[in-house]
Amino acid sequence: MAAVESRVCETEGCSSEAKLQCPTCIKLGIQGSYFCSQECFKGSWATHKLLHKKAKDDKIKPEVSPWTMDGEVNTDPWPGYRYTGKLRPHYPLTPMRPVPSYIQRPDYADHPLGMSESEQTLKGTSQIKTLSPEDIEGMRVVCRLAREVLGVAAMMVKSGITTEEIDHAVHLACISRNCYPSPLNYYNFPKSCCTSVNEVICHGIPDRRPLQDGDIVNVDITVYRDGYHGDLNETFYVGDVDEGAKRLVETTYECLMQAIDEVKPGVRYRELGNIIQKHAQANGFSIVRSYCGHGIHKLFHTAPNVPHYGKNKAVGVMKPGHVFTIEPMICEGGWQDETWPDGWTAITRDGKRSAQFEHTLLVTETGCEILTCRLEENGRPYFIS
């Protein structure tokens, strides 16, 4: 702590002379923050550290609101932020797109914080819902529609197209199918799909950066209709990509399909991570540990928790009627991740590329049904066909 002129200690109930100031507050430009001793400073830490968070949040807020378009000038939203790779956000973003009132909306759609109260009610529970025949049919319908919407996005992917344009097409495709785009306002996520380019692991926010030849981009689609969510994603090549990108994308898809091959009643959810890790590591890649697959039906995210790395401690055994996603995120370098200051965009800490594929699955009496399977090309993903 730095020495400063005499002040009164700011710890509640202490009136001693204070000559020490919090060094983090000095760095962040926070006025005050004087303490008489290390003991008083430590005793106030629980509440004092909130000042640091607020100051940091205020510092990264762009002068121009990121949710409004102001000409074509690209604004750096986070001056001083140290990016791990070459990708940069292209701000400001366009406003959050409206959804017609006649389309059924999930409970978080109009919540000021985008909070799903139905999910919060079940937060922390490991109980896995067994879907009724009616529920299963609802999931089949919505997953088929989600697949159609991903097909629209797939046709958009090429050099020069922005992820913002892909998001716009996805939004319109959802509306035309009487679906709500599930990501929109989910805990205030500002767009209708996630687009994750190169070193972005997941939850990338579509913006005005044009895709470039050699990029890889994951488009993650979830749609909501008649009370159910359907979720899937694929990673696409943009133009001609190098052999490293091809090997990463191919291995990631193989990890997903090898895990799916093991889905059947009686299998522990924790086993899927062992299968994925074995194949990824055999090819020299690592597995992201911070994000995982999840149960899905009337709730966007719920039990079970489905980690993609080995020796995990996931709870639960597969039973007929369970519906969940597997969505491995595989990295060229290390598995460690960071998050951009937007609070969403997860990126590799070493700046190397990451790829992902996802399906929503139904456990049947004898195995599983891939609810989001592509109907064309014998179910093969777009990077193959």
UniProtKB/Swiss-Prot annotation:
Q: Which residues make up the binding site for Zn(2+) 3? A: 220, 231, 358
Entries under SUPFAM superfamilies matching the protein: Creatinase/aminopeptidase
**Keywords linked to the UniProt accession:** Aminopeptidase, Cytoplasm, Hydrolase, Metal-binding, Protease, Zinc, Zinc-finger
Give GO terms: molecular function aspect only: initiator methionyl aminopeptidase activity; metalloaminopeptidase activity; zinc ion binding
Coarsely, its chief localization is cytoplasm
Catalytic activity entry: Release of N-terminal amino acids, preferentially methionine, from peptides and arylamides
Binding residues for Zn(2+) 4, per the UniProt record? 231, 294, 327, 358
Q: Where found?
A: Cytoplasm
- Subunit comment for this entry? Associates with the 60S ribosomal subunit of the 80S translational complex.
Q: What protein does this entry describe?
A: Methionine aminopeptidase 1
- Organism equals Xenopus laevis
Q: Which gene encodes it?
A: metap1
